[in-house]
């Protein structure tokens, strides 16, 4: 088959298009508004698709012959028969061949209130060399052909009996496949994985900030499965220290106030049980003061201080 160098000859005329114009037609639009009009010799909406016999060129020569396009290129091309009396198209090119892949996809038109098959879309891949030992390339072709071709008359069949022309026009979209999309997808998933790891690490740090309780501060009421208030406070100054749980005892009656503060922060005094500047006697705790003293201690002692959006107990250094 004759080969033509893409570097020779004048470049195809460029269409007069407005700035920012993009050509991204659907399959239906390609068949109805371009291929069908071309086959019927009707003027096209815009002269943006060049007439090129694709099988006389290798795919890397075609972008220079296109009227428009940067990443994909559109052409009107004739199709020839592989054998004079057969219906198989000739897919041979200059230094290789086009091989069909997958099954034909119907092009459906939804205009007029119904669905109608108006064309067929076929996907092909270019192979360098000769079949069946060709080397697969990244060049892809989408070939569109009409399905409503008029039946061939007997006289026409006699005139075309020795002709190799199978179709006067098919519409082809050519592009080169690359791995940039897959690479970007993998890169995106990698970043998501890293972000999740950092998020989990930050949450572990925040959890450890509250999990590692300083020595001398105990939480049997929080981490115990026993809901009996008498098991939490034994009425004396020993054990876990009654003053440390005066808040929990006050809210044990079912008041809605127990929902306002996390259990880990329900302490009236951080100096009790820790041995830091406190000489309070058991008489000032539950066994000496009763529930009324509990309410008084709640009003007199600031429970939490807002530091940077985190409520902390006064007198306790969470970061030591």
UniProtKB/Swiss-Prot annotation:
Region feature (Disordered): 1-22
GO biological process, any: seed morphogenesis
Observed phenotype of the null mutant: When associated with disruption in NAC056/NARS1, abnormally shaped seeds, defect in embryogenesis arrested at the torpedo-shaped embryo stage, markedly delayed integuments degeneration, and delay of silique senescence.
Keyword presence, DNA damage: no
Organism: Arabidopsis thaliana
PROSITE patterns: NAC (PS51005)
Subcellular location per the Swiss-Prot or TrEMBL entry: Nucleus
Species lineage: Eukaryota, Viridiplantae, Streptophyta, Embryophyta, Tracheophyta
DNA-binding region: 118-183
Keyword set, alphabetical order: DNA-binding, Nucleus, Transcription, Transcription regulation
Name assigned to this protein: NAC domain-containing protein 18
Domain NAC: 17-177
């Amino acid at each position: 088959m004759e080969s033509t160098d893409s570097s020779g000859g004048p470049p195809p005329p460029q269409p007069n298009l407005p700035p920012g114009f993009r050509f991204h037609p659907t399959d239906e639009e390609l068949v109805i508004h371009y291929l069908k009009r071309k086959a019927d010799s009707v003027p096209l909406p815009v002269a943006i698709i060049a007439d090129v016999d694709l099988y006389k060129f290798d795919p890397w020569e075609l972008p220079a012959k296109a009227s428009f396009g940067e990443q994909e290129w559109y052409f009107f091309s004739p199709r020839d028969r592989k054998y004079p009396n057969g219906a198989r198209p000739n897919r041979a090119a200059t230094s290789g061949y086009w091989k069909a892949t997958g099954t034909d996809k119907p092009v459906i038109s939804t205009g007029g209130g119904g669905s109608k098959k108006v064309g067929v879309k076929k996907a092909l891949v270019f192979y360098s060399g000769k079949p069946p030992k060709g080397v697969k390339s990244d060049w892809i072709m989408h070939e569109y052909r009409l399905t409503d071709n008029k039946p061939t008359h007997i006289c026409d069949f006699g005139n075309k009996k020795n002709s190799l022309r199978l179709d006067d026009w098919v519409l082809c979209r050519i592009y080169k496949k690359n791995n940039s999309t897959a690479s970007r997808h993998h890169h995106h998933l990698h970043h998501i994985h890293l972000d999740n790891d950092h998020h989990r690490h930050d949450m572990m740090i925040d959890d450890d900030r509250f999990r590692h309780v300083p020595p001398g501060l105990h939480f049997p009421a929080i981490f115990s499965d026993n809901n009996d208030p008498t098991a939490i406070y034994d009425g004396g100054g020993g054990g876990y220290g009654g003053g440390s749980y005066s808040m929990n005892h006050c809210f044990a009656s079912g008041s809605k106030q127990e929902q306002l503060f996390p259990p880990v922060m329900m302490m009236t005094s951080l100096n009790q049980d820790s041995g830091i500047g406190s000489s309070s006697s058991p008489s000032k705790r539950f066994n000496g003061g009763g529930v009324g003293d509990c309410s008084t201690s709640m009003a007199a002692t600031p429970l939490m201080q807002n530091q940077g959006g985190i409520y902390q107990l006064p007198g306790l250094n969470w970061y030591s």
